[in-house]
Amino acid sequence: MESVSSRGGDPVVKPSMEVWHFQIAVYFAFGFFFLRLVLDRYVFQRIALWLLSTGSAPIKLNDAATRAKIVKCKESLWKLLYYAACDFFVLQVIYHEPWARDIKLYFHGWPNQELKLSIKLYYMCQCGFYVYGVAALLAWETRRKDFAVMMSHHVITIILLSYSYLTSFFRIGAIILALHDASDVFMETAKIFKYSEKEFGASVCFALFAVSWLLLRLIYFPFWIIRATSIELLDYLDMTSAEGTLMYYSFNTMLLMLLVFHIYWWYLICAMIVRLLKNRGKVGEDIRSDSEDDDD
């Protein structure tokens, strides 16, 4: 692909999106698989054992419940590392971009917006992670009661990522991804505190998670992001053509489906909040407990 330099010095990829670009996402997916294997064995296992051993009771490695908790702790360590790293990266990339703070600029210049190489790699990384995530849900991670919902979420996210990239909606796509990862950082941190029986840390992080979910996914996402795709986008699409109409309704339908998932999980979060208040600040079991009814 041909590239040029932007004023900020970051290479800019000309917006000639092609399907073969997603080979990079496939490479990322395989890379995540092998990286997870290495980290699980040599890093996360040791961290999980250390975290669980600092709890109130001595750790029993021959206990099935303890082994299950170690597996879940490693899952959360992996996800925390990924979400925190990705969010830090994309925030660094878009911090100085004027369109990051003005919804009227999300589509300004579309479809001939410049695609920085950093945003392209970020997109392919995220797409690869969710491709890996589908495989991990099927064959690796703890099977939880919301498996079908989570699988549907991952599939829709992959389709939305691919669609927004191929249609050059990558500005608003990067914002959406950053919003989602921010909440997940707090969620995985709260889980790690819970597994290590640090109730105060778990309660604080869960509260931050709930607030961030409400603000980012239930307020900012529908009233800023979906508003932009529903109203601002109309200034750039030819709604008299079949292509423009299909593009408009396809993109917004997928975003609304994500919002439905957000509302569903907010219901579960509210149930957790009720438990937390009843337990006087102690975070209870995750409503999304796994199929074997182990504590999450």
From Swiss-Prot:
Which InterPro entries does the entry mention? Answer: Lag1/Lac1-like, TLC-dom
**Per the record's keyword annotation, is Phosphoprotein included, yes or no?**
yes
> In this protein, which residues make up the domain named TLC?
71-278
Q: What pathway annotation does it carry? A: Sphingolipid metabolism
Recorded hits in Pfam families, A to Z, give: TRAM_LAG1_CLN8
Q: What is its EC number?
A: 2.3.1.291
Q: What is its main location?
A: endoplasmic reticulum
Q: Any idea what a deletion of this gene does?
A: Elevated levels of free trihydroxy sphingoid bases as well as ceramide and glucosylceramide species with C(20) to C(28) fatty acid, but reduced levels of species with C(16) fatty acids. Better resistance to submergence under light conditions, but increased sensitivity to dark submergence associated with declined levels of unsaturated very-long-chain (VLC) ceramide species (22:1, 24:1 and 26:1). Increased susceptibility to AAL-toxin triggering programmed cell death (PCD).
As for membrane topology, the entry says: Multi-pass membrane protein
Please give the coiled-coil regions recorded for this protein.
Answer: none
Q: Which residues span the membrane?
A: 19-39, 80-100, 121-141, 158-178, 206-226, 254-274
Which residues carry the post-translational modification Phosphoserine, per the record? 289, 291
Its activity is regulated as follows: Inhibited by the mycotoxin fumonisin B(1), a sphingosine analog mycotoxins produced by pathogenic fungi. Activated by divalent cation such as magnesium Mg(2+), zinc Zn(2+), manganese Mn(2+) and calcium Ca(2+).
Mention one GO molecular function: sphingosine N-acyltransferase activity
* One GO-annotated biological process of the protein: endomembrane system organization
Q: What is this protein called?
A: Ceramide synthase LOH2
Q: Which organism is it from?
A: Arabidopsis thaliana (Mouse-ear cress)
Query: Quick one: which gene encodes this?
Result: LOH2
